[in-house]
């Protein structure tokens, strides 16, 4: 199996993890069910309590940072660019809420982008969430779609014993049926589109782009259809850029930073990222080994083994304000007493020590190109000003 296919397949486990946590009552996301593979019985999707709580903390933290970005100066139109969006349901909740004040772009491998566009076309509840007319450009490439097979987790890496308890059998994610595919019309010529990106869905406020992120390494290459460089913009990378080699990952971020800090742009770019890190300890090394046995490599785990290394990386790339916290810190510092009582009542967490150790190896990172000066590493301003209220570990 190719490395690209292995990385694409990790979205299946992320989806099942989110659905299991939703089904256990940690949050409400009824749209997740629409993305489940047809051969999966929703009633049989279960995860251990420590995984459900970890998924909840990850979803909660990313959502809070995104919501705060959108609510700060809420009368200003903003833009979200989600890298490796996969089966994320977030746009179908945010677009109806913010409508003309939000432009939302999702980038993923072409096959994943195509599958999501097909799913939107199939389900009215998804299509109706998108303001304005929706255009589809779903074509059949030379190679037909193949079922997506569940591989290794995008979220958590259990121990061998925990993996054996969680029922990690194969799961297939079939592309949606009943959608007429057709050749692309009005598509860029090969000379205009040397990297073969495609846009299987577009609307006045929502685009799905099929593109290999490794081709987005220059300011010109990130100028995909519909991206507005004059808008305050948030990059979202949930376990996405970590699959690239560090130099490639840095180049992608640098390309977006340069594009958004040019004289004609907004100079207002932020990032919210979720990635594992090794902590350069035994548990981190076991995580890396377990991933390797499944064909998965996450190069950034060793290249940036600590929260401080990731924050220094963001600042070095041009995010003048940057902060971070591991999921254990976020769990303890961001969840208020009432919410903690609620989630404590959902499931008995016998494995608290294991939970703390596990989530301490996953980090949430946030940063922005605002302010322009380097006077403070935590001086969030403008559309990112609300982030100053979030407790930070680094």
Language model features with spans:
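Rossmann-like AdoMet
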Residues: 1-209, 216-217, 223-225, 229, ...
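Short secondary-structure boundary/capping segments
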Residues: 97-98, 251-253, 286-291
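Rossmann-like AdoMet/SAM-dependent catalytic core
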Residues: 150-153, 160-168, 174-182, 282-394
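General small-molecule cofactor/ligand-binding pocket signal
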Residues: 207-209, 272, 322-325
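Short, conserved secondary-structure transition motifs
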Residues: 214-215, 276-285
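A short, conserved alpha-helix within the catalytic core of class I
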Residues: 214-221, 242-260
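A short SAM/SAH-binding and catalytic strip from SAM-dependent methyltransferases
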Residues: 231-247
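Conserved beta-strand signature within the Rossmann-like core of class I S-adenosyl-L-methionine
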Residues: 233-237, 259-280
């Amino acid at each position: 199996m190719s490395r690209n296919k292995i990385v694409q397949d990790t979205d299946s486990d992320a989806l099942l993890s989110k659905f299991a946590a939703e089904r256990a009552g940690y949050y409400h996301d009824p749209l997740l069910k629409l993305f489940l593979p047809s051969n999966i019985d929703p009633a049989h999707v279960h995860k251990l309590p420590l995984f459900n709580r970890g998924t909840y903390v990850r979803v909660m933290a990313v959502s809070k940072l995104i919501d705060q970005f959108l609510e700060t100066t809420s009368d200003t139109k903003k833009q979200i660019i989600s890298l490796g969006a996969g089966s994320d349901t977030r746009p179908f909740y945010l677009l109806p809420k913010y409508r003309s004040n939000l432009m939302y772009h999702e980038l993923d491998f072409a096959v994943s982008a195509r599958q999501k566009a097909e799913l939107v076309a199939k389900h009215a509840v998804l299509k109706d969430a998108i303001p304005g007319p929706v255009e589809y450009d779903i074509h059949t490439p030379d190679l037909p779609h193949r079922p997506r097979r569940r591989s290794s987790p995008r979220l958590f890496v259990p121990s061998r014993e925990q993996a054996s308890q969680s029922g990690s059998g194969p799961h297939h994610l079939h592309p949606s049926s009943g959608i007429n595919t057709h050749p692309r019309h009005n598509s860029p010529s090969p000379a205009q589109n040397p990297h073969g990106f495609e846009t299987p869905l577009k609307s006045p406020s929502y685009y799905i782009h099929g593109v290999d992120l490794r081709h987005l390494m220059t300011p010109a290459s990130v100028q995909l259809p519909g991206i507005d460089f004059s808008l305050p913009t948030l990059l979202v990378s949930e376990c996405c850029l970590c699959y690239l080699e560090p130099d490639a990952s840095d180049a992608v971020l640098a390309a977006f930073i340069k594009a958004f800090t040019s004289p004609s742009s907004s100079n207002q770019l932020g990032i919210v990222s979720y990635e594992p890190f090794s902590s350069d300890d035994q548990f981190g090394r076991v995580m890396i080994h377990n991933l390797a046995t499944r064909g998965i490599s996450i190069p950034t785990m060793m290249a940036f083994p600590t929260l401080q290394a990731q924050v220094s990386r963001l600042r070095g790339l041009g995010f003048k304000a940057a902060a971070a916290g591991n999921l254990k810190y976020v769990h303890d510092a961001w969840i208020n007493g009432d919410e903690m009582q609620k989630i404590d009542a959902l499931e008995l967490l016998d494995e608290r020590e294991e939970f703390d150790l596990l989530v301490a190896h996953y980090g949430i990172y946030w940063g922005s190109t605002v302010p322009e000066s380097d006077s403070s590493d935590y001086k969030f301003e403008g559309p990112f000003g609300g982030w100053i209220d979030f407790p930070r570990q680094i």
